[in-house]
Amino acid sequence: MSLKYVIRPMTEDDTFAVELIEQGIFSLPWSQKSFADACRNQGNVYLVCEADGVIAGYCGMWTVLGEGNITNMAVSPDYRRCGIAQMLMQSMEKYGNDKNVTSYFLEVRQSNLPAIALYEKMGY
């Protein structure tokens, strides 16, 4: 049985599940309030990936003057190696292009080899 994935804009109702993923992965996690504030800002793009109705991953980007700053990207350990991160990035770029973003940038730890491989594969 394969899962059905849906990429959609993050809502405030999603922020609790997103915060749980964030806390399980990062040493300095964003709070639920930080995600709620970010997804309310019209200049931002915050997306989630649902796997059969469960939040499996998320990404976020701030947009300013044609630049997209990718601020967050995480996939729950239970859903890794399924292509979710790439789907999220591609969807985020589409939303960014709709907001006239012409260049994207991000930061990643040198030790995060899977993320580096994904970003390089996508041309970052």
Q: Can you annotate each of these PLM segments?
A:
Residues M1-S2:
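Short acidic N-proximal helix/loop "leader" segments that mark the beginning
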Residues R81-K94, L113-M122:
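Conserved acetyl-CoA-binding loop-helix of GNAT-fold acetyltransferases
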Residues Y5, P9-D78, M89-S91, Y95, ...:
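Acetyl-CoA-dependent GNAT
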Residues S76, R80, R109-S111:
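Residue-level recognition of the GNAT/N-acetyltransferase active site
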